Amino acid sequence: CTIKWKVSNQENNSKEEKVLQKILDILPKKFKLRIDPNGGWSRQKAQEWSNELRDEPRLEWIEQPLPSNDIEGLFVLANQIPIALDESLVEFPHLKKIWKSWQIRRPALDGDPRLLLKEIEREDCHAVISTAFETGIGRRWINHLAARQVKGKNPCAPGLAPGWCPEGALFHSNPKVVWEAV
């Protein structure tokens, strides 16, 4: 099981540090933890969390700890602790080719999903399939890609945000219903 924790970007938040300790105290050994500050940390704060979590075996990664344009800082951190890129990949698509750690990939933003399908079947791929705001048709592709990735050479729990999808014909899982709504 994988737990994702969205954290704040406040520079001095001792409450979050206490929550982290509580999470680590109760998190079963088989669980994985992902921490997501949405690019809101300074290098100093990211380094503090890195120092705290460096030897934590349940940490899967910290997702986009620094602003998307702090590429140098992200590479420095990635040499110390697992870092997954998210917003940086949207702003700087060339990073998809050179970032060797995990990448949060949103097929609806990536373009042709067949290219991502080929990519996730490679042994050196560290893509994590995630959602944006898709219609029912896009959601079907995402579910297909996520299922392939989970069974692939580098399996990883996808970020599918279950239960967020609005109701209505555009978000229906049957393409015919979506098409008729359009």
Give the positions of each predicted feature.
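Structural alpha-beta junctions
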Residues: 27-31, 56-58, 122-127, 148-154
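Flexible C-terminal active-site loop/helix
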Residues: 43, 132-182
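Short loop or secondary-structure boundary microenvironments that flank
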Residues: 9, 39, 109, 131-132
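Metal-dependent enolase-superfamily TIM-barrel catalytic cores that perform enediolate-based chemistry
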Residues: 1-81
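A general structural motif
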Residues: 63-67, 83-93, 105-115
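Anion (oxyanion) recognition and catalysis
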Residues: 77-78, 121-123
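Hydrophobic faces of well-ordered beta-strands that scaffold small-molecule active sites
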Residues: 1-5, 31-37, 60-63, 83-87, ...
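Catalytic cores of alpha/beta
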Residues: 43-53, 72, 90-99, 111-121, ...
